[in-house]
Amino acid sequence: MKRKICKALICATLATSLWAGASTKVYAWDGKIDGTGTHAMIVTQGVSILENDLSKNEPESVRKNLEILKENMHELQLGSTYPDYDKNAYDLYQDHFWDPDTDNNFSKDNSWYLAYSIPDTGESQIRKFSALARYEWQRGNYKQATFYLGEAMHYFGDIDTPYHPANVTAVDSAGHVKFETFAEERKEQYKINTAGCKTNEDFYADILKNKDFNAWSKEYARGFAKTGKSIYYSHASMSHSWDDWDYAAKVTLANSQKGTAGYIYRFLHDVSEGNDPSVGKNVKELVAYISTSGEKDAGTDDYMYFGIKTKDGKTQEWEMDNPGNDFMTGSKDTYTFKLKDENLKIDDIQNMWIRKRKYTAFPDAYKPENIKIIANGKVVVDKDINEWISGNSTYNIK
């Protein structure tokens, strides 16, 4: 929040100075705001691969949903490039990185990073946007759902690159941008058209075995990220040759396309079968996705909290305070809350609320637009608020 101005300034200084001299493009696979570039190629080929690999035994509902997805292909492409242009994003793209061996992005693992560590990672972003996509799809909002799915696949593509799962940034190596430019310029020759099997064979069949969506998604992503990280050290650093880079781009871009096809296959089965990833699962964490109104002065610098009360009367509350500026007019902010009692089911939570506490004697009013709460890969609360919250106030959302 703005009140933590010192570290915000540190982060801003890093953003302007550490990336200087490398490039203004500090993200992973290239992508343009109009839905073109390497990221868009990956998702487009992912759908094409799945269509080519579809077994004749696939349920009609899956086929129908695949057709709906194809009808919204441009939204998938736009979503796949949007995270690199999102005005709400972290300046250093910290949440686009994920080391599959440490479960961290570079803000926790790299010694040169002196500002706040960022809890979100490329892997957690995949799960968040997949949950939002599934929720909107089941409501019939296919356009928005497909855009969210594209965002999820952006992060999946990021953690398949050699540099992002190795937590090697443009600060650590000039090769970060150079390699991804190399891949972008040659992306057409790295296209694949099949995962090498039909959807009733091992690769796709294994994708459907684990009904715990969060657990499946994390381990599925981990497998591809480990390959990308290994390729960085064996073929993609600045010490490697052009032939090595060609091999690295060929392998990791093929993995991105194949992995995307598999992820979309899981998504289509989940929405076609009405799978509820949260049934019977203990809730270890809650993810809040909060939209602040775009109305003038809707944001706040006051303290903001999220709390729950369980049926046995116990309460837990967390401060919502991301590094830098959050709760700004028109912003969308994400917060992850770890529960003390890991044996809770979602139905054990009786009440949820957000609370505002004055930071100064002259508090801001705050106008949230919407809040969604995600548990175990499912949106369990979707609350339109659109009310001004003034002073020291509590707003119940459940």
UniProtKB/Swiss-Prot annotation:
Zn(2+) 1 binds at W29, H39, D158. Ca(2+) 1 binds at D297, G299, D364, A365. Changing D158N: Loss of all enzyme activities. Vaccination of mice with a fragment (residues 275-398) protects them against a subsequent challenge with purified alpha-toxin. Its cofactor is Ca(2+); Zn(2+). Ca(2+) 3 binds at T300, D301, N325, D326. Binds 3 Ca(2+) ions per subunit. Binds 3 Zn(2+) ions per subunit. Changing L54M: In strain: 8-6. Keywords: Calcium, Cytolysis, Hemolysis, Hydrolase, Metal-binding, Secreted, Signal, Toxin, Virulence, Zinc. Ca(2+) 2 binds at D321, N322, G324, D326. GO terms for biological process: killing of cells of another organism. GO terms for cellular component: extracellular region. Changing P363S: In strain: NCIB 10691 and CER 89L1105. Residues 1-28 form the signal peptide. InterPro entries: PLAT/LH2_dom, PLAT/LH2_dom_sf, PLipase_C/P1_nuclease_dom_sf, PLPC/GPLD1, Zn_PLipaseC. Its EC number is 3.1.4.3. Coiled coil: none annotated. Residues 284-398 form the PLAT domain. Residues 275-283 are annotated as: Linker. This is Phospholipase C.
